[in-house]
Each structure stands twice: as C-alpha cells, then as structure tokens.
Amino acid sequence: MVDKPAGNAFDVLVVYHGTVMRDALVMQAANDTLDAFRGLLDDPSIMVVSVAYPEENLMIGDNLVQAEAALLWVKNQAASQLGVQIRHIFLGGHSQGGYLVTRLNTLHPTRGVIANAPGPLDLVLRCRLEEDGTIAAGEHCARLRNAYGSTTANPSAYMARSLRSFTTGYQSDILFVQGLEDSRLIQMESWPGFRQQVEACTNCKGVQFLELAGLGHTALFNSTQARDAFRAFLNARR
C-alpha cells in the first residue's frame, strides 16, 4: 500500500501493522497503520509504504520473509516501478510490526527505525502464562506448542523467536517507544530485561528509548511527546 505525494524524489517511511489474526483483516490493518504513521509526520512530502504482511496459520517470526521482501522492494525496485527517486528509507512498526522492524534492523541498513511497543519480547514467559491458565490461550502459543512442545520441555525454541533474542547487531539508529501502562504480564514484565540487553549492545548503531508514563500499547500515536520525538528522530537523519 503506497501513499505517494506529488513530486519525483522522496524519503520513504515503510510501516508495519500490529497483530492481525486473520489475513482477511490485513489490508484494513495496513491502511489504518498508514494513516496512523502519516498523522505523526510533519512533512507531507514523505512517501509512506504500509506493508500488508500475513499472519494467519504462521508462527511468530515466519512472516519476516514477507516483511523483508517489502523492504527490499522499496530498496531495489520501487524507484523504477513508480518512476521516482528514493532518497532515504526509514522503518516504523507497531506491536508485532515493531518486532519485525527491529529484526529487519539486524539484516539491512536504513536511515533509521522506530518501534512502538515491540513484541512479543519473551515467548517463554508469555506462552507459559497461557499454559498455566494465568492468561487466555491464543493461537500463536498454540502453534509453537504444536511444533515444539511446552515451554518447559523446549524453552530455547520459544526464546529463539522472541525479540529478546534480537538485541545486538542493529545496523541503523533505532528509537523504541513504550507506554508504561501496557499489559503488565505480556509486555511490561519483559520490558526492563529487553531494554537492559539492548543498552548493553556493543555492535549496535545508536539506540534511544522513550518510556511514557500513563500511556499504554499505542503510546506513540497518543502522545505529543512521542510524536515530537518521532519527528525529531526522522528529521535529524534526513
């Protein structure tokens, strides 16, 4: 989904939506995410590409293939297919989209990455909570359990797909935004450890964290402080 302003040369923001369990809902999620990120920008000349990646019947992380393909299209084919000049490329993602852009940052350099409430951070913890009935069971953990067994039997397989396993080797500057009133068990229980791991990285480009009290999972889109930080991050790298 491409939102191309008038003109011939563009900086491009490639954005990734959050979790959508059914592929029939993906296009709407991509459109909503395009609108949400477009609303943060203070420059209408930026082209926004919203990626409608699949999720139905996939395990967490398997859709990195489609997420990467979209980025590579922007890098290598968008200019010729759209008849434009591509200048700088930025990535933005919310929730599972934040997970994907963080992982993409270990694979490909861009001009910068913004990840809001990225996750899942720790699938061992999350799926164990489902196994013991603390939180409601969901499809993602069920697929992992069918493939790997329980978190007790095979924790390393769950951790290998968790974002806490991708906290080094960031090839571009990244801004993490996190509302501190996000889900306590699913997100905030793992957030301090994730941040500590990232801040200990010795082979990452610049890393910034913005934590927002009183805000939840969609903090980036509900805070003037987050909006201003988002704009400052982009504008400093254009």
Locations of the language-model features?
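A conserved short beta-strand
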Residues: P109-P120
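Short beta-strand-to-loop junctions in surface cap/lid or active-site-entrance loops
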Residues: M1-A9
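Short glycine-enriched nucleophile-adjacent loop
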Residues: G98-H108
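Short beta-strand/loop motif that positions the catalytic acidic residue
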Residues: Y170, F176-G179
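C-terminal catalytic histidine-bearing segment of alpha/beta-hydrolase fold enzymes
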Residues: I60, V177, R184, S190-R195, ...
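Mobile cap/lid helix-loop segments that gate and shape the active-site cleft of serine hydrolases
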Residues: P118, L123-F166
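Gly/Ser-rich "nucleophile elbow"/oxyanion-hole loop immediately N-terminal to the catalytic nucleophile
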Residues: A69-S95, L107
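Short substrate-entry loop that stabilizes the transition state in hydrolases
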Residues: N8-F10, G18-L58, R184
